């Protein structure tokens, strides 16, 4: 898999929403021993723990989702076509993002959000407003 400094190295990445991202990051790092890897404003952060990664996000108003999952894949468009053929509920089609990823999102029958992501470029987080703490 192509390396991208803007993304955690893990293949499966849980995303947990909180009302106060900074407070959650401080608590998770202090209490569980996570390390802050990347900060994006006050609304998103990536944390590391050994070989694992976790994304802390700002909770969306009216959101019923308690968590979501990001899965990194090698061939996003092929993966998307497979999912699309199964009549899954696609909430956003594949798109390229300034942080070097091509992603699409699906909602599963339980209402959980799954974002599938493929690295398309190694992007320095500074170029889009991120602060990288570890590489």
What is the predicted function of each stretch?
Residues 51, 109-110:
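Residue-level recognition of short loop/turn positions
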Residues 38-39, 44, 62, 98-99, ...:
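A short acidic/small-residue loop/turn micro-motif
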Residues 32-35, 86-91:
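A common structural junction motif
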Residues 11-19, 45-48, 61-86, 102-107:
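Vicinal oxygen chelate
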Residues 1-25, 67-69, 117-135:
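N-terminal beta-strand motif that seeds the catalytic metal site of vicinal oxygen chelate
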Residues 27-30, 82, 110:
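Structural preference for long, well-ordered alpha-helical segments within the folded cores
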Residues 8-11, 15-54, 60:
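Core segments of cupin and vicinal oxygen chelate
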